[in-house]
Amino acid sequence: MRAMVVDMNDKYAVVVNKEGQYIKIKRKAEHRLGYQVELPDRVIGFERRTLLKVVSVAAALLIVSSISFAVYSYNLPYSYVNVDINPSLEIILNMYNRIIDVKALNSEGEMLIEDSYKNSRLDEGVEKIIDSAVAQGFLKNDEENTIMLTVAGKNSRKVLEIKEEVESTANKVLNDDNVVSEVIVENIVLERREEARELGIAPGKLLLIEKLKEVDPKATTEEYKDKPVNEIVKTIRDIKKVPNENNRKDDDKKVNNEPNKPLPDRKADVETSAGVKENTAGPDAGIKPVNKTDNAKPNVGTDINNKENKTVSNAKIDSGIDKGNKDSKPNSNTKINNDVKKDNKDNKTNSDAKTFNDVSKDNKNDKADGNAKINNNINRDNKITPINPDNKFSSGGSKDDKDNKHVDSKDKMNNEDNKNINNGSCPQYNPYWNPYWNPYWNPYWGNPKEKEDMTKQNDEWFKKMQEEQKKQYDEWLKKMQEEQKKQHDEWVKKMEEMKNTEKMKNPYQENKIEKPKEAEKENKPDRPPEPGKEILKKRC
């Protein structure tokens, strides 16, 4: 049987026989394209049946390999979730977040293991574990409970997703079971899990023990290895609450005469400084002392029978001096409020000192240097309160010094004005509300009535503005609606007029007049005869 060579390769040649079949044969040296050759008895070729067999075998192998890979990947551990209460469990997950296995890390954890955990979702497994822990009494309603959850895995993004899912499911289950418990969720590295596994402890408990060692270096892993999570957390918090010995050193070093920080005025001092009343004995009468000294607690301890009361310059004084005090020398940079008693003889303050003095009867020499601000708390029988806004000097007179007047006429104040000194007309002076160095100072803090009036005025103004704006908006809206309605009505009328007239017709048909066909024929010119045709007709 002969065939023609169509294609050739290094090893094979393709020929076509008379029937049109393509046959593959071995190439020989005499084979040339387009030549006819004799076909051998044995021909190399693929039939349809053999091809189907090969394809089916390949497909079967592919299906088997894919199934085996899916089974292998399904059973391959991908991430781990540890649940620590006192029973410790480890949930092993695959890459699809399905539970492959649940292992108990201690004897109590074996009580919570069930066969139904396998092939279930993570949230279902966590829910079953917490429910069984509540049912078996590991989590109680009356006690403080703590659940430690640790997540470890190969993919950090997936670890964070599992962390959020586990925390939300745990809180949901605890709320459904009416159990109050603290849920602590942490993510760890796989190396830390292996370290905890070598020590025979849960990873979450290992983290808590390391935190306990930071607070208490004496703590050991073996000591807290078998203790529940709740107890470890409680010990950490108790140790943090106890103050250190280093924090007490500053308190022991403090001396009564040298406070570290200036203290604000007490409520009792404010009440006594505000009590200025009329004096019935006359304008030149002696100054009587204030007897309200029980509530005034001294910040600086002073000895009895001191002869002189001296304060160093640039000192702010806040102290209570008992009867018979004659000499008191506090250190500089302190605030002392002097309630001076009967037997004080010399009360001398240097420049730039701010004092609040309650002056007694027998004070003979009460001298204050320049640049001093003095606010004297005077009893009922006092009538004159010397105030020096120019910071020159201010003194309280005695019986022997009636004729000596060191105060200008501008600096005198009436007792009736002093009555209302704290009723809103003049706020009580406080160095902590000084606007020059306190950025949060507000002058209305001392006057709540003025603040209420201002808020009322603001509210009334705001309401008026709202009403005016609403009226303006309503008027504008009405005008706009009327204008739009007028425009719409005009447009509708115009459209109706256009429809009724012939202007809406086709403009090409307006001037066109229909004429009868006969008239068109009459107006048409006759067609001229073709040359030669009539002659032929006549001849015929």
UniProtKB/Swiss-Prot annotation:
Cytoplasmic membrane side: 1-50
Basic and acidic residues composition bias: residue spans: 238-256, 319-329, 338-351, 359-370, 398-419
Residue intervals passing through the bilayer: 51-73
Entries under InterPro entries matching the protein: Anti-sigma_RsgI_N, RsgI_M
Gene behind the chain: rsgI7
Keywords, sorted A to Z: Cell membrane, Coiled coil, Membrane, Transmembrane, Transmembrane helix
Induction: Up-regulated in pretreated yellow poplar (PYP)-grown cells.
A Pfam family: RsgI_M
Primary role: Anti-sigma factor for SigI7. Negatively regulates SigI7 activity through direct interaction.
Location in or out of the cell: Cell membrane
Source superkingdom: Bacteria
Biological source species: Acetivibrio thermocellus (strain ATCC 27405 / DSM 1237 / JCM 9322 / NBRC 103400 / NCIMB 10682 / NRRL B-4536 / VPI 7372) (Clostridium thermocellum)
Residues in RsgI N-terminal anti-sigma domain copies: 1-48
Chain spans, region Disordered: 238-429, 481-540
Topology in the lipid bilayer: Single-pass membrane protein
The protein's name: Anti-sigma-I factor RsgI7
GO cellular component term of the entry, any: plasma membrane
